[in-house]
Amino acid sequence: MLGETMIGTGGVIPPPPEYWPMVCEICKANDVLVINDEVITGFGRAGTWFGFEQFGSDPDLITLAKGLSSGYLPLGAVGAKDHVFDAFLGGPGEAFMSGATYMGHPLCCAAGIANLEIVEREKLVERCAELGPYLQDGLGTLRSHAIVGDVRGVGLVAGIEYVKDKATREWFAPAQGVAAKIRDEAFQRGVFVRMLGGGHVHAVAPPFIISKEQIDTVVRVLDESIGVVEKQFGY
C-alpha cells in the first residue's frame, strides 16, 4: 500500500486522523507492506522530522527527497525497517543484487549530509513546529472570504481552496481563472503562491526561516488579493 502521507500536488489535503492508523491496521493484519511517500512532508515541513509522525502512520518503508538535500543537488532515498532491509541481505546466491548508475552519488550525498547537519544544528524542525500553528491560524482568517471554501494544512504547508459556492463546494470553471488571477495579484504585491489541485487551490509553503512578520505579510497580501478578485466576480 503506497500513499502520500498527506496529499500534496492534489491540493494539500491532510488525511482524517483515523485514516493512516486504520490503513496500517488492515495492511499489517493481511501481511501487506505500508509505504509512505514523505517527499513533501519529510525533514521538518510538517513540524516533525517526518509527516507520518503527525498522522499516526506506522510505515514499513518511506520515500525521501526534496528536504533531504533542500534541492541544492538532486537526491532521493528509501528508508526501511529492519524486517524489510534484512530481506536484501545474505551471502552469495542469497543477497538481492541490484544497482543503479547514480546510486550513492558522493557529491549529492555530501550535500544531503551537510543539509541535514544545518537543519539539526539550527533546529529548523522545531522552528516549523513553532511557526506552523501561527501560519495555519493566520491563513485560517481567509475563510471569511466568500470564495474561500477551505484552508487546510499542517506545519509550514497549507492549501487555500477557492469555490464558487460555499454551500455546494462547487468550483469555478477553469476558464474563469480565479486562482490564477489571485496568484497574479499576490505576485504584484511580492508574494508567490503555487496553483495545485486542478487550478482550484493555492499552496503556501514558505521556507523554514520565515519570520512571524513575514507570515503576517503573506496573510495580508493574500487577503487583499482575494478581495480584489472577489469584487471582479461580483461578490
Predicted features along the sequence, with ranges:
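Conserved N-terminal phosphate-binding loop of PLP-dependent enzymes in the Aspartate aminotransferase
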Residues: 2-235
